[in-house]
């Protein structure tokens, strides 16, 4: 199932300027999600990272993956109305820079889901090429 930005805002508490997802292309609650982030030159971070050579910081790619994973978790009926907090990060790797004009495709597969936590593997791609990956842990509250 696809989600619009309005539907994403019904699931996640994040708002501008920190809601990093523009759309969810597919979500299977409790299993996986595919989301998009359109990287634009107007994003405030590019004023300082880096002037004349804008590059999306890796931490924002990881946060985008975490928000996508949170959608997969919080779409489950038992977690409706809850918040997913970042609980941990392992094996993060960055393979290519992300710049204005890129569209990040964010894929997260949930590997474990418990009553108060979840774990997943995330991959971020641009034009079909892997730009980042990480294992993510979520705490649900």
Curated annotation (Swiss-Prot):
GO biological process: fatty acid biosynthetic process; lipid A biosynthetic process
Keyword Lyase: yes
Role noted for this protein: Involved in unsaturated fatty acids biosynthesis. Catalyzes the dehydration of short chain beta-hydroxyacyl-ACPs and long chain saturated and unsaturated beta-hydroxyacyl-ACPs.
Entry keyword annotation includes Cytoplasm: yes
Signal peptide span: none
Gene Ontology cellular component terms for the protein in this record: cytoplasm; membrane
Family named by the database record: Belongs to the thioester dehydratase family. FabZ subfamily.
Enzyme class, UniProt record, top EC level: lyase
Subcellular location(s) of the protein: Cytoplasm
Pfam families reported for this sequence: FabA
Catalytic activity: a (3R)-hydroxyacyl-[ACP] = a (2E)-enoyl-[ACP] + H2O
Name the record gives this protein: 3-hydroxyacyl-[acyl-carrier-protein] dehydratase FabZ
Annotated PANTHER family: 3-HYDROXYACYL-[ACYL-CARRIER-PROTEIN] DEHYDRATASE
UniProt xrefs under InterPro entries: FabA_FabZ, FabZ, HotDog_dom_sf
EC number(s) recorded for this UniProt protein: 4.2.1.59
Predominant cellular place of this UniProt entry's protein: cytoplasm
Active site (catalytic residues): 49
One GO MF term attached to the UniProt entry: (3R)-hydroxyacyl-[acyl-carrier-protein] dehydratase activity
Annotated keywords: Cytoplasm, Lipid A biosynthesis, Lipid biosynthesis, Lipid metabolism, Lyase
């Amino acid at each position: 199932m696809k989600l619009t930005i309005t539907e994403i805002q019904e699931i996640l508490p994040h708002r501008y300027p920190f809601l990093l997802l523009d759309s969810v292309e597919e979500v299977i609650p409790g299993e996986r999600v595919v989301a998009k982030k359109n990287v634009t030159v107007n994003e405030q971070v590019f004023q300082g990272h880096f002037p004349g050579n804008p590059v999306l910081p890796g931490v924002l790619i990881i946060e985008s993956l975490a928000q996508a994973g949170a959608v997969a978790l919080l779409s489950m009926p038992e977690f409706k109305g809850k918040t997913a907090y970042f609980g941990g990060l392992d094996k993060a790797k960055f393979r290519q820079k992300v710049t204005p004009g890129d569209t990040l495709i964010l894929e997260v597969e949930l590997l474990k889901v418990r009553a108060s936590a979840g774990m997943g593997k995330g991959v971020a791609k641009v034009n079909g090429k892997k730009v980042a990956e990480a294992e993510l842990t979520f705490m649900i509250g």
